[in-house]
Amino acid sequence: MPASDQGTLTGRYTLVPRVLIFVTRAQNVLLIRGAPHKRLWANLYNGIGGHVERGEDVLSAGRRELLEETGLSAELRLCGVITIDAGPEAGIGLYVLRGERPQGELIASSEGTPEWVAQASLAGLPLVEDLPILLPRLLQMQPGDPPFSGHTSYDAHGRMHIRFSSP
């Protein structure tokens, strides 16, 4: 099928693809504390991630973002997909990845400082708003579990609502 038959008509709702990566090591998870100068999530802990660039698949984007933001490489697997309703014309397609068996030395980047955090300490950290919902779901997953599917929306007061589909 040629590209012209893919149905990407103007005026349709579109998704911007992004990856969000959580690398685990024993009972620790790698998070990045946002740099103080960041417009979004300054000084808050988040997963590693960013945009999928043209020509990349999701796992390649995850590997690139992980290396750029932390200096590490890891074995990645898809754990979930969340559509985020960010506006009337464009949303975000968020591919949630889990990394295991990390290799390399941690480095800071312009995005922030990566830190290994004990899973038991997560509740006491200043986390990005959706992490208290996403992390428990991701961390309980076992190899071979099907990826989860979710949708994030915002109400008239700007409050985030996340719902997950049943398998």
Where do the language-model regions lie?
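Conserved N-terminal beta-strand and adjoining loop/helix that marks the start
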Residues: P2-L30, H51
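Active-site-adjacent beta-strand/loop module that shapes the phosphate/pyrophosphate-binding cleft
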Residues: I84-L106, V128-Q142
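Short, well-ordered beta-strand micro-motif
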Residues: V23, V96-E100, W116
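Conserved Nudix-box catalytic region and its N-terminal flanking loop in Nudix hydrolases
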Residues: N28-E68, M160-P167
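C-terminal regulatory/oligomerization modules of transcriptional regulators
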Residues: P143-P167
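Short, solvent-exposed loop/turn elements at beta->coil junctions and helix N-caps
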Residues: L9, C79-A86
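A short coil-to-beta-strand element that immediately follows conserved catalytic motifs
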Residues: G71-V81, F148
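NUDIX/MutT-family hydrolases
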Residues: I107-L138, G158-P167
